[in-house]
Amino acid sequence: MPLRVIFMGTPEFSVPTLRAIAKAGHEISAVYTQPPRAAGRRGLELTPSPVQREAERLGIEVRTPTSLKGEAEQAAFNALRADIAVVVAYGLLLPKVILDAPRLGCINGHASLLPRWRGAAPIQRAIMAGDLESGMMVMRMEEGLDTGPVGLLEKCAIDPDMTAGDLHDRLMRVGAALMVEALARLAKNTLTFTAQAAEGVTYARKIDKSETRVDWTRPAAEVHNHLRGLSPFPGAWSEIDIGGRMERLKLLRSTLSDGLSPSEDLGESGGILDDRLTVACGAGAIRLVEVQRAGGKPAAASEFLRGAKIVKGMKFS
């Protein structure tokens, strides 16, 4: 039985779920997304969110409030008489009156294995911490931050060199299918929600710019996890002399260097060890696989080396 759905989401991660719900035949009465943002060199252009663009393509009404705390916005939401609200990376706080408005409440697609990595940046934090698995969960929303009971989950292995971008793309596809299944089971009253475990709670705080500079004194595994957890955005970076000028280089992909003992003395941390962009860390080394110069496009390390004279003995700072 089709449900009357309010969809709430903003970034590209949310789009496959919106598309899948529409394809499954549910009635999407409105889409809530964050307002268009200033873009362009002078900030004079307003760019709609990826979800807004998709909703307009599907012919669905779009609403872009800056807050849902006002009585007028809450009344407008309630007037939709929705069966359920589906929330995927919306970005605004939902007051209790909003959570309680739909007949079946609000459910959320969250990209972690709760209660690990509640909060804003679960994909990045999982990789930065060296986790071996992640996943998508559908949970019933309540006032606490990602504290609600879980209805469905699907696990996903985190491969050794997988970046946050890779995991993002995998989980957004998994999440779309999982949400369609959740709605189908809710319509039949066959979906059971189970309280999260009290143990193992961690928080995925938003990534801060101060975290993005690489600390080469850390062990190679930690540096590798740091790089891939921040790739492609905002991107971990370090500086190196290119043509007599210190240049900031984004480090987008790496791998742990083979054949090196973590305890082996490789010299100064940040030092270039060979002609393949192998870099010494506090213990062990990593090999850079993909980098990006300021103002340039991402490039394979081999391509970058053809245009930049980086040789053994040079050093990242």
Curated annotation (Swiss-Prot):
Its EC number is 2.1.2.9. The keyword Ribosomal protein does not apply. It catalyses: L-methionyl-tRNA(fMet) + (6R)-10-formyltetrahydrofolate = N-formyl-L-methionyl-tRNA(fMet) + (6S)-5,6,7,8-tetrahydrofolate + H(+). Keywords: Protein biosynthesis, Transferase. SUPFAM superfamilies: FMT C-terminal domain-like, Formyltransferase. GO terms for molecular function: methionyl-tRNA formyltransferase activity. The keyword Cell membrane does not apply. It is an enzyme of class 2 (transferase). HAMAP family: Formyl_trans (MF_00182). This is Methionyl-tRNA formyltransferase. The gene is fmt.
